[in-house]
Amino acid sequence: MDLYLKNTTFVIVCFKSQEVIYDCLNTLPKEANKIIVENSNNLNLKKDLESKFNNIEVIINENTGFGASNNLGIKKSKTQFVFILNPDVKFREDTFDNLTKTCRSI
C-alpha cells in the first residue's frame, strides 16, 4: 500500500470550506499527497493547513470555478494517481484500500 500512497495525490477544491476540510484531511492517508486549491484567498487557512498536515500543498487561487481549479490541482500533481474530492468527503478506514484494489484491476 505504501507504493500506492506515495504515487497518489488527492486534489480538493475549497471555497470557504474551513468548517469541513479538517475532517476530510484527517480521514485521508497521512502518507498520500494532498493539494488544496483554496478559492477564497484565505491565507490563514493555508498557513494553518500547511502547519498541521504532512504532504500538503495549499494553492491560493483566484476563484476560477470548480473545474478550472481541479485542473490546476491536477497539473500541480506529480503522481501517477490523482483523486478529486470535495472538502466534505470523509474516508472510511478501508476506502483507500478499496480504491487501490480497483485501480489494480483496471
Enumerate the predicted regions with their spans.
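Cell-envelope/extracellular polymer assembly enzymes that use nucleotide-activated donors
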Residues: 7-9, 33
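Short, well-formed alpha-helical segments that are part of the catalytic scaffolds
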Residues: 14-31
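A conserved acidic beta->alpha catalytic loop
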Residues: 27, 36-47
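Short beta-strand/loop segment that forms part of the nucleotide-sugar
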Residues: 32-41, 57-60
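Glycine-rich, basic loop-to-helix element that forms the pyrophosphate-binding segment
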Residues: 60-77
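Short aromatic/hydrophobic "clamp" motif used to bind/position activated sugar donors
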Residues: 82
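The conserved acidic donor/metal-binding loop of glycosyltransferases
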Residues: 86-90
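Conserved donor NDP-sugar-binding/catalytic core segment of glycosyltransferases
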Residues: 93-106
